[in-house]
Design a protein with these regions (language model features):
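Polytopic alpha-helical membrane-helix bundles and their juxtamembrane interface segments
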Residues: 1-41, 50-158
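Conserved phosphate-interacting/catalytic interface
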Residues: 47
Length: 158
């Protein structure tokens, strides 16, 4: 597939890394096996997509089996993250979480993350084409900035 470069794969790794670090930080404060499994599945799904793009960029081979786990792993990972939060609802200091989220500058980064993820959802539904390099660049830039905003929001929240 034309235009799938090593650079695209490396940019695709940014949101996977940012999200992974974010999940490690949250997991250190919310020790839940379900949360950890969900985070691991989500990150592994992203790693599969990065690996697919790396192979495309380096060897010019389309190993679609590397890309296929992305959606099911991400969806099941996010579902487990949500279930873990619901199951651990009473164990979470929601007042503390809320105060951290609305603190400045964290709230700016969290707001940007939510907006960018909403835009990403719209973009993937309406414009994204998996086989188009330009479409992948756009999606990865949106996702890289969004996941970095999540990480910065968490870091500034303390």
């Amino acid at each position: 597939m034309e235009g799938f470069t090593i650079g695209l794969a490396l940019v695709d790794a940014i949101p996977v890394l940012s999200f992974g670090i974010s999940m490690v930080i949250i997991a250190s404060r919310f020790p839940s096996p379900l949360f950890m499994i969900g985070a691991i599945l989500s990150v592994l799904g992203g790693c599969c997509k990065v690996a697919w793009k790396l192979v495309l960029g380096i060897a010019k081979k389309d190993l679609r089996w590397l890309n296929k786990p992305f959606v099911p792993m991400m969806a099941s990972g996010f579902l487990l993250l949500l279930i873990s939060l619901i199951a651990g609802f009473g164990k979470i200091d929601w007042a503390g979480v809320g105060a951290a989220i609305i603190s400045v500058p964290s709230i700016l980064f969290f707001a940007a993350w939510i907006g960018l993820m909403g835009f990403m959802g719209w973009y993937r539904k309406n414009k994204f084409r998996n086989d188009d390099a330009a479409s992948n660049w756009t999606a990865q830039i949106i996702n890289a900035v969004g996941q970095t905003c999540l990480l910065l929001g968490i870091l500034f929240a303390g």
